[in-house]
């Protein structure tokens, strides 16, 4: 989910999200730096979100999702509208997230659904009419 508040800088936005998620104050700075490093947006932290490319906005959305280290991360159409290079980068990020989190991915793009995110882990594919 790309960020909604595009008039904030990346850092301001992640601080806001950390507060909403009730991350303890003494852990916020550390966690924000860790997720920015993870999704490779540290060099964008002082830029307004509205001035970022679609790929970087997606990364900010991933950082937001990872903040607080939830056990499950749900991603809806994480590569829609990205160029081929950005798709590869986001896929790699999702694979790395899958090492520490359960990632639920939703996409109507067949190539995205068929992409092998699941090497060495459990993976499930279901069509909408067959979800239970």
Describe the residue ranges of each PLM region.
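Conserved ABC ATPase "signature" region
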Residues: 15, 19, 26-44, 95
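Conserved ABC ATPase signature
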Residues: 48-52
């Amino acid at each position: 989910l790309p960020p909604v508040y595009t008039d904030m800088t990346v850092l301001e936005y992640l601080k806001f999200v950390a507060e909403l998620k009730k991350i303890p104050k003494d852990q916020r700075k550390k966690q924000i730096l860790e997720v920015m490093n993870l999704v490779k947006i540290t060099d964008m932290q002082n830029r307004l979100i509205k001035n970022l490319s679609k790929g970087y906005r997606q990364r900010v959305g991933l950082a937001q999702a990872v903040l607080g280290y939830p056990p499950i991360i749900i991603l809806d159409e994480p590569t829609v509208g990205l160029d081929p290079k950005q798709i590869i980068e986001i896929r790699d990020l999702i694979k790395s997230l899958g090492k520490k989190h359960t990632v639920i991915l939703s996409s109507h793009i067949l190539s995205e659904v068929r992409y092998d995110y699941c090497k060495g882990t459990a993976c499930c594919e279901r069509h909408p009419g067959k979800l239970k």
